[in-house]
Each structure stands twice: as structure tokens, then as C-alpha cells.
Amino acid sequence: MIKVTRSSSPREVYTTSMLLSQYIRHQIASGESSIWIAQRNGRTKDGYDISEQGVLKMLQISGSGDFYTDMCQLDMLPTAISYEFEPCDGLKAKEIFVSRRHPYTKKDGEDLTSIITGIASWKGRIKVCFTEPILPEEIASCTSLSKNERFVELGKVIDRQIHKAYCLWPNNYIAEEILAEREGRDPLVVRKCSRPAHQTFLIHMEDRIDQAVKALKAEGEFKPVDGANSSEADLRYELEDIFLHIYANPIKASLTAV
């Protein structure tokens, strides 16, 4: 595991980013090994993965300065990892719930807890899909844009590959179906799922929400947004809504990638 420094002084962040970029470029260009890089600072919280421009910029800073040459040299291969059960779903719902009320501050050891939970928790079925490599012509299509827009567009190219490669499990369709009913609309996609699959997902959601409510109460965070008059049932409903979007958003992402 490679640690990426994000919260130090600008000079230290640049120095460590340059070292990391040089290492990655050397390993790939020399053929010694491939490097796996997460798109964001941890897996996305709401189930909608978007590539991080900062990571793409970090990858180029060790190059020659020519966008096309530098990015082609990295031989990028987008990869989609789809879990039947998101291992940190309850923790993510809890974090989003709190962040709606005030800026979220991580507690000591929270990252380690998330890593251990992500490794050890039940995930059900898992599919890892390696997409087609990013083609030179796709990189070339970004070169006429401004410096910042190049990375935005390249990120979109990567995202389309990943979103198209998502494996959508019954849980995704069930969550979308429940959300559509709650919001009074038609589901984005209709997929017949078995009654046992529905029951399993609902039991899983109830268990995770129970854990989140217990933790939020212990931390004094199970409370309405400032100025709102919300009952405990309303707050639980909000947590469920957040949880359901974590599972339903990959459907939206896959549809927009077509």
C-alpha cells in the first residue's frame, strides 16, 4: 500500500506527489510492475464513482510536460470492482448523514476501521472487470483543450469505461425500485428480483441502519439539520434514503455511460 500525502503544506504535498508520480511512471515504463490506483480518497461514499482530477494531474507531473506523450506512456486500464454487498455501506451512510449537518471530521483510527471493515466484511459476490485500455486517440482528443479541461475530459473517458463495466446485482435493482416508490416515479430500470433477494436486502439494510443509529446516538449526532423539526422516524428514514442511493446510484452511472 502506498500512502498519499494530502493534508500537509503545499510544498510537501507537491514533493511527495512528484516522488510518487516518478515511481509509478518508472514502474510502468520499465515494465517492472503495474500499479493499481483508487480514483478517489477511498471508495466513493454515495455509490457514484467519479475520477479524481488531482490523481490524473499527479500522474503527469513526472513526465516531459507533453500531455499526449505523458499519458500514453502510463498505459491506463480502467477497472470496475462491483460488490453485491458494499462492505462499508453503513459507515458511508453515517458519514453522509453527519456531513449534511456540519463538516465531517474523521476521528482517530477511523481510516483504519474503514480499511479493516472493507477487507473483513461480507461482500457477497464480487466481480472485477478490466476494461479496454485508454486508447492513444482518446488521449489525443483531450489535447486541444485547456490544461485543466484536458484532465476533466480524460476523467470522463475513464469514468465511461468503468460505469459501462459495472456489474449490477439484484441489490442495485431492489434499491432503485424502493427509491422510485418512495419518490413517486418509475424505476430507471425494471428488473424482476426474487422475493428472497428482497428479504435479504431489507434485512441487511435494517441491520446496517440499526448500527448507524446506535453509533450516531452515542456520538450525539442523531439529530435534525439545523432548523428542521424531524422525529426519530424521520431521521431513520433519511438514513435509509442515503443507504438506498449507495446501491441505486451505480444504475444511474451505468445508464449515463452508454
Give the ranges of each region predicted by the language model:
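Membrane-interfacial amphipathic helices and adjacent loop/beta segments
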Residues: 1-19
